[in-house]
């Protein structure tokens, strides 16, 4: 059985909502984000490495037995981290692994849970004063029961942090340096609440000049670098304030996972492109201040999506905002993580 074959209007509605947020780069980028629905002791959750944008075209949901997974989380069973041992093999026609965030969805009691990487949310959630700003923005929304969650590594550590702040009424979780989780009884309820929360967090994007793509193309000619798939990516190098934000360090996990830590800046030697000498490997993404952005020819679709995401987020953060970036230790625990390596192999 597949989730696409289940005759249930809520399943259909979740697939439609998943696809809707999946094609909106301001809500979800690449293989990021995940959705779930709980039915008859089974939680159907987006499979690792799949794209929410494909929810209507492909079977992207994996069935997980809820009760044993919750017990494993409570007991400190290390199998809860990957959750592969709790997949219902008879229902899992796709054979895919569950999302890295399966434990997060499992500990939230609500039947429907949606986790997105909303750029307006992240632009607030990377700030040291973000929690107070978030609460102020959500004050007019009486139905929102908020939990502000400090940064933790995605997956089981994040699930434990959420569990410590979870009440029976909590339905919105703002995750520091990460994103947004919205929960509810029905897909329609979650969709409405998510839309209102994202609108409450709206921030205008700073304007930037257009990139001189002809000049950039001539600079990368004969090198291993290419222009980004989305021209909006160039903003992070063209807007000095956005570039200053990006230079601070890694703002959220998927940047590290798909692009590597921080932001490399290319050097021009007689008009020829050179990577910064301190980088042991060719960076997947490089900024040319005042000119634009280039990506390595090996960069995946996910990497291109995350490059655009960085531009979108940085352009929404005021230049004087107190920004928290991931520490070196937090970056290291995201790199060479087996679960993320698998996700990248599926999502290229």
Predicted regions and their residues:
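Glycine-rich flexible loops
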Residues: 1-348
